[in-house]
Swiss-Prot record:
Active site positions: 10, 131
Reactions mediated catalytically: 1-(5-phospho-beta-D-ribosyl)-5-[(5-phospho-beta-D-ribosylamino)methylideneamino]imidazole-4-carboxamide = 5-[(5-phospho-1-deoxy-D-ribulos-1-ylimino)methylamino]-1-(5-phospho-beta-D-ribosyl)imidazole-4-carboxamide
Organism: Brevibacillus brevis (strain 47 / JCM 6285 / NBRC 100599)
Name of the protein this chain belongs to: 1-(5-phosphoribosyl)-5-[(5-phosphoribosylamino)methylideneamino] imidazole-4-carboxamide isomerase
Keyword 4Fe-4S: no
UniProt similarity note: Belongs to the HisA/HisF family.
CDD domains: HisA
EC top class, as a word: isomerase
GO biological process, one term: L-histidine biosynthetic process
GO cellular component terms, semicolon-separated: cytoplasm
Classification via Pfam families: His_biosynth (PF00977)
Amino acid sequence: MSFIVYPAIDIRGGKCVRLFQGDYGQETVYADSPLAMAKRWVEQGASWVHLVDLDGAKEGKPANAAIIKEIARSIPVPVQVGGGIRTEEQIADYLEAGVARVIVGTAAIEDEPFTKRILQNDGDKIAIGLDCRNGLVATRGWLTTTDVQATELAKRLVTYGAETFIYTDIARDGTMTGPNVEEIAALAMATGKSVIASGGVSQLDDLLTLATHASDGVSGAIVGKALYTDAFTLEEALQRMEGRESYAG
């Protein structure tokens, strides 16, 4: 199975930013134009771009949708979008605007009838965002931690038609401490579905370690801070992934 590197663009107040461990009080602005940043990642070889509406995640409804739709229309690679998407109308709006995959987090945990419906209608275009703290799912922009075990929830959602999960380890997001490879691989094996890793990637070796679990279903990694702080470039990451595949093949 191929392994996709997703450069992340987190949007707050119309700008490209990064938060530390999801803390809205610890923000770094990296670019005034998310669209220019998306084009930059495409120029460097991105095959997908990962977009997050941080204002939307906090407010519970899309807040930077116009910018996100413009990016989806303007770049030649697919985009996946998360942040504040909690209704069928919002999902349809993004899909009609050219977004390839919509990430649903809070609503998937809090409203299972809704989740059942959207997975039955658009399962291949939906990713379930599992944002976790110590293996428990967090919701509402990471402000609330539930008592729901990520693996148990994921297995239940697979019965409704879930095909793709995005696993974020909140304690590692933006910290550059390395991803939680064990939990990510365990989730992929427990569900038999595609799991994209998010949070903590700090060096190329982290990507290579995750990619060794591609055959288990770990299908990619979302990378943010490591790219923005020049820990490595997207081009370097993609070259290493290609080298891994030709070596493995």
